[in-house]
Amino acid sequence: MTNEEIKRLVDEVKEGVIAXRRHL
């Protein structure tokens, strides 16, 4: 995996965590 791919995954995870928290 390239650094760009890793950064994208990290951003997606962060967005998912924030969304989740907002739903709660």
From Swiss-Prot:
Its EC number is 3.5.1.14. It catalyses: an N-acyl-L-amino acid + H2O = an L-alpha-amino acid + a carboxylate; an N-acetyl-L-cysteine-S-conjugate + H2O = an S-substituted L-cysteine + acetate. GO terms for molecular function: aminoacylase activity. Disulfide bonds: none annotated. The keyword tRNA-binding does not apply. It comes from the Bacteria. Homotetramer. Belongs to the peptidase M20 family. This is N-acyl-L-amino acid amidohydrolase. The lineage of its organism: Bacteria, Bacillati, Bacillota, Bacilli, Bacillales.
